[in-house]
């Protein structure tokens, strides 16, 4: 997701334009055209030579600085799928996992890029993260799109071996969906219960770094394969 930037000649960037202009416009010294040209030429040579005498490390810093702005794709720890009305609650849960448990980076579905199809965002969210958290609230089952999200996530975890057990239903503190109203497909999975005393232990058992690393490696290899095929 990053865009590279073109390099520019540091000599051209370093020429003291203020001084060279004063030489051209000043009439008090009545300098000849040849003398002006010689002085400007020496000025430019001095700047370029001073740049050439810089240590290799500093020259690399000057030339490569634009590349530091290049953004790379990041494999997320988790994505939270939620009803539109639960965006605030999803943000709270995201902050809880990231700040209290150190599970980051994560994202909520509402923060996915705008201007793209929902299906593309859903695919990127589920396959671009190690765990998919379904925020089970009263609003979740009222939204047809949410139903599609959790069925798609479950099918993805079944069809892809490395995504097995990656879908995590979670009942938050605020407006949780009662167990008896939870779809059967989700009742077969142990849900995270935020109000439970064992919630911290549940979080530690589920979000293991070793599992994340395995999925991250598979994700990188898949992405590299796709890039090679597109170039070919």
Swiss-Prot record:
PTM annotation (Phosphotyrosine): residues: 164
CC annotations in GO: cell projection; early endosome; endoplasmic reticulum; endosome; Golgi apparatus; late endosome; phagocytic cup; plasma membrane
Region (Disordered): 1-71
GO annotation (BP), single: positive regulation of type I interferon production
Bias-annotated ranges (Acidic residues): 55-71
InterPro entries in the cross-refs: TCAM1/2, TIR_dom, Toll_tir_struct_dom_sf
Biased composition (Polar residues): 19-29
Pfam families given in the database record: TIR_2
One GO MF term attached to the UniProt entry: signaling adaptor activity
Key words, A-Z: Cell membrane, Cell projection, Cytoplasm, Endoplasmic reticulum, Endosome, Golgi apparatus, Immunity, Inflammatory response, Innate immunity, Lipoprotein, Membrane, Myristate, Phosphoprotein
Record field: compositional bias (Basic and acidic residues): 1-10, 30-42
Description of post-translational modifications: Myristoylated. Required for membrane association which is critical for its ability to initiate efficient signaling. Phosphorylated by PRKCE in response to LPS. Phosphorylation is essential for its function. It is depleted from the membrane upon phosphorylation. Tyrosine phosphorylation is inhibited by phosphatase PTPN4.
Sequence ranges assigned to domain TIR in this UniProt record: 70-226
Residue positions of covalent lipid attachment, annotated as N-myristoyl glycine: 2
Localization annotation: Cytoplasm; Golgi apparatus; Cell membrane; Endoplasmic reticulum
Function comment: Functions as a sorting adapter in different signaling pathways to facilitate downstream signaling leading to type I interferon induction. In TLR4 signaling, physically bridges TLR4 and TICAM1 and functionally transmits signal to TICAM1 in early endosomes after endocytosis of TLR4. In TLR2 signaling, physically bridges TLR2 and MYD88 and is required for the TLR2-dependent movement of MYD88 to endosomes following ligand engagement. Involved in IL-18 signaling and is proposed to function as a sorting adapter for MYD88 in IL-18 signaling during adaptive immune response.
Domain notes: The TIR domain mediates the interaction with TRAF6 and MYD88.
Oligomeric form and interacting partners: Homodimer. Interacts with TLR4, TICAM1, IRF3 and IRF7 in response to LPS. Interacts with IL1R1, IL1RAP, IRAK2, IRAK3 and TRAF6. Interacts with protein kinase-inactive mutants of IRAK1 and IRAK4. Isoform 1 interacts with isoform 2; the interaction occurs in late endosomes and disrupts the interaction between isoform 1 and TICAM1. Interacts with MYD88; the interaction decreases after IL-18 stimulation in a time-dependent manner. Interacts with IL18R1 and IL18RAP. Interacts with TLR2. Interacts with RAB11FIP2.
Record protein name field: TIR domain-containing adapter molecule 2
Organism: Bos taurus (Bovine)
Gene expressing this chain: TICAM2
